[in-house]
Amino acid sequence: QVMSYEPMVLLMAVAFFQASGSFDVAEVFQLNHPIICTIWLVFLGVLFILTIKLRKSPFDLSMSHHAHQEIVRGMTTEMSGPTLGMVEIMHWCENVLFLGWIGMFFLWANPVSVLVAIVIVLLVYFLEIWIDNNFARVKWQFMFKSAWLVALIAGGVNVAFLAFL
């Protein structure tokens, strides 16, 4: 899964730098307009990989070798107590991180932008839940190919456009 979504994450970081002129997150609060206005293709790519990162269908890959283990809990079947707790907490920390990146697309110098970003993050999270409940699993090969294709087209085109801007 990591090999599928990481190229888009790297392209997102490059696009944020090209659009804001800095890797400092505080710079987005100095912009005159939301950064999504210049890197909207990257945003679409990040939406695509967010489904992979949140482990939602169709990209919630099976991690166990036996069907009965997958029914129980997948790769966390043999975990319990503090170990399982740490895995679950870190999964939610990753969710907050990625949803925070979604919110960064909608921040600018206007204080209202924080409210706009929060509303959009909630809408995106509910979209992910809807996708999870309405699509069947795909094989890992399809996930890998489609994620790299989206990263190449959405991220690559947007980064190339910003390079010549």
Please provide the spans of the model-predicted regions.
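Alpha-helical transmembrane segments of multi-pass membrane proteins predominantly involved
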Residues: 1-165
